[in-house]
């Protein structure tokens, strides 16, 4: 997900997106732990998306 797309969203939408990403991250970690994860690059991708959303939430809180 691009930061430009995220900047257009409201705080409520960002919180919803963050919750969805954290759920996805949990599911991916469980798959990795059980050896079922085929696409390991998704772990890194979701982790960075979570960081992007958290950064934008912090920016919007300060503004």
UniProtKB/Swiss-Prot annotation:
Belongs to the universal ribosomal protein uL29 family. Keywords: Ribonucleoprotein, Ribosomal protein. GO terms for biological process: translation. GO terms for cellular component: cytosolic large ribosomal subunit. It comes from Citrobacter koseri (strain ATCC BAA-895 / CDC 4225-83 / SGSC4696). It comes from the Bacteria. GO terms for molecular function: structural constituent of ribosome. This is Large ribosomal subunit protein uL29. It holds the Pfam family Ribosomal_L29. CDD domains: Ribosomal_L29_HIP (cd00427). PANTHER family: 60S RIBOSOMAL PROTEIN L35/50S RIBOSOMAL PROTEIN L29, LARGE RIBOSOMAL SUBUNIT PROTEIN UL29C. Signal peptide: none annotated.
């Amino acid at each position: 997900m691009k930061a430009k797309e995220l900047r257009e969203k409201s705080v409520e939408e960002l919180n919803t997106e963050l919750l969805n990403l954290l759920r996805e991250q949990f599911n991916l970690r469980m798959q990795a732990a059980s050896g079922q994860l085929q696409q390991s690059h998704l772990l890194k991708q979701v982790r960075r998306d979570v960081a992007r959303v958290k950064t934008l939430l912090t920016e919007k809180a300060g503004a």
